[in-house]
Amino acid sequence: MRLILRPEYRRMLLSLDPSEGRVVTRTMRRIERAREAIGKPLRGGLSMCRSIRTGHNSRLRIVYRPFDNAAELVAVGKREGKVVYIIALEILEN
């Protein structure tokens, strides 16, 4: 799967600390290697997106929108208070 990084996603990725950035990069490679969309399907305004945890005990999530042979990475961040999902919805609505 080819990865498409939105400009907002790039900024969010650069704002993470280096150790979180490495874990997110590994998860991005998992998405890239997958033949089908992986992660949890989302509902509501993000029903066209999926969310994947970056690690077993991680609170970081990547929200992405799968297409035929590509995945558009929309947002990355902590799940605390569903902030990453609210940001992803705002990004997609604009």
Task: Outline where the language-model segments fall.
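Arg/Lys-rich, positively charged N-terminal/basic patches that mediate binding to nucleic acids
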Residues: M1-M28
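A structural signal for alpha-helix termini and helix-coil/disorder junctions
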Residues: S15, R30-A34, N94
